[in-house]
Amino acid sequence: FISHMATTTNFEGGSFGRKFSISRENGTENKEGVPHFFEWIKEIPQEKGNRKFETRKGKDGNFRNYELFRAIDGHLIDIEVQTKDFSGKPEEWLVLKLADGEEDYQIELGQIDGRYSMDTMKRLLDPSFNPNQKVRLSPYALKNDSGSWNIGVSIMNGTDTKLSAKRESEWLTDIPEATKIVFNGE
């Protein structure tokens, strides 16, 4: 069930249309919040309807507004590795570019060896992936009974093809494990 999907709005997204990143809903207070695609917006509209919004305080002390989406769909038109500078340290990030009619989306999946990026690339290697069909992306984070997390991006391709990322799939036998990173002691 997809509760909120990115569609055309009146907000400007920069040089490549609209730009999204993955973060957890209420993630500054709840480290186990539901992952969403976050899109920066100038201000939260008066009429919210069923849309989700969140305001976060940045490191510089300024507040930033975001609209949250559970899923984004479009035709995959490019995959890039972009180098981003965080506090003087370069990081390689995986970025997907989608087109949906007149709209272009840039989706930052995080570090190239992170779980969202690795899971997405495994799914795009699925032999049933058809680049001529739309993809629908939805980030997830599921905690199992032992307390460990299964984190990734669910990808539907076309009308009913869910792309697989199972380790036992023959096309994934030699793929490396995602890097486990300790962030702020966690």
Language-model features and meaning:
Residues I2-L109, M121-P127, L142-I181:
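OB-fold ssDNA-binding interfaces and closely related basic DNA-contact patches used
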Residues S117-S138:
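Short nucleic-acid-contacting surface segments enriched for D/E, G, S/T with interspersed K/R
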Residues G110-M118:
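GIY-YIG-like beta-to-alpha core
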